């Protein structure tokens, strides 16, 4: 995987107040660890971030008023893959699983389409060749290898 590949950490979902703050939908647990983010062909310098409704409220140095904040609605904010912290053995980033082939007893059953966390652990959504999708619990049903995911047959529809 390219270390320069952009990884989306948040999306601007709207303006907050009159001073240029934005509401963010977060895809990371520690947004404050990243001071410079890219989006819409620009760089943004994170000044402050705090919990907010459905995510967080942030102030960026480059966004000075509500109009500028509203204009960025829908903008995805990313960092290079190389900016993410290193992983311990057995850990993974959700983005690293997306697109990997999924196999059951050596036979392909689909491709990893999405990873969700509903609170009890990660759940992998697999898309079959016919476009139908099914979900399996990562901790109980998935063995993660560098270039593929091995799925326990008991969890396959």
Curated annotation (Swiss-Prot):
One of its GO terms (cellular component) is cytoplasm. Belongs to the RimM family. It is found in: Cytoplasm. This is Ribosome maturation factor RimM. The PRC barrel domain binds ribosomal protein uS19. It comes from the Bacteria. SUPFAM superfamilies: PRC-barrel domain, Translation proteins. One of its GO terms (molecular function) is ribosome binding. Keywords: Chaperone, Cytoplasm, Ribosome biogenesis, rRNA processing. An accessory protein needed during the final step in the assembly of 30S ribosomal subunit, possibly for assembly of the head region. Essential for efficient processing of 16S rRNA. May be needed both before and after RbfA during the maturation of 16S rRNA. It has affinity for free ribosomal 30S subunits but not for 70S ribosomes. Binds ribosomal protein uS19. The keyword rRNA processing applies. It comes from Rhizorhabdus wittichii (strain DSM 6014 / CCUG 31198 / JCM 15750 / NBRC 105917 / EY 4224 / RW1) (Sphingomonas wittichii). Pfam families: PRC_RimM, RimM. Residues 89-156 form the PRC barrel domain. Its main location: cytoplasm. The gene is rimM. GO terms for biological process: ribosomal small subunit biogenesis; rRNA processing.
